[in-house]
Amino acid sequence: MNQGRIWTVVKPTVGLPLLLGSVAIMVFLVHFAVLTHTTWVAKFMNGKAAAIESSIKAV
């Protein structure tokens, strides 16, 4: 492991909670952004059927 020396600078009891906490915050922010900036994700999460926006005409 080439990043093993990081624990000589930061204790694992401090570094691991910071790392896992920052990952959890980023995951929350990404999910919040997807839910607030799309119209179909919230409906999908609530079990609604997908609506077809346009129909394809047969040739």
Curated annotation (Swiss-Prot):
Superkingdom in the source lineage: Bacteria
Residue spans, topological domain Periplasmic: 36-59
Entry GO MF terms: bacteriochlorophyll binding; electron transporter, transferring electrons within the cyclic electron transport pathway of photosynthesis activity; metal ion binding
Places the protein is found: Cell inner membrane
Residue ranges of the TM segments: 12-35
InterPro entries linked: Antenna_a/b, Antenna_alpha, Antenna_alpha_CS, Light-harvesting_complex
GO terms for cellular component: organelle inner membrane; plasma membrane; plasma membrane light-harvesting complex
GO terms for biological process, alphabetical: photosynthesis, light reaction
Xref: PROSITE patterns: ANTENNA_COMP_ALPHA
Chief location: membrane
Membrane topology: Single-pass type II membrane protein
Binding site for a bacteriochlorophyll: 31
Quaternary structure note: The core complex is formed by different alpha and beta chains, binding bacteriochlorophyll molecules, and arranged most probably in tetrameric structures disposed around the reaction center. The non-pigmented gamma chains may constitute additional components.
Function: Antenna complexes are light-harvesting systems, which transfer the excitation energy to the reaction centers.
Protein name as it appears in the record: Light-harvesting protein B-800-850 alpha chain D
Organism ancestry: Bacteria, Pseudomonadati, Pseudomonadota, Alphaproteobacteria, Hyphomicrobiales
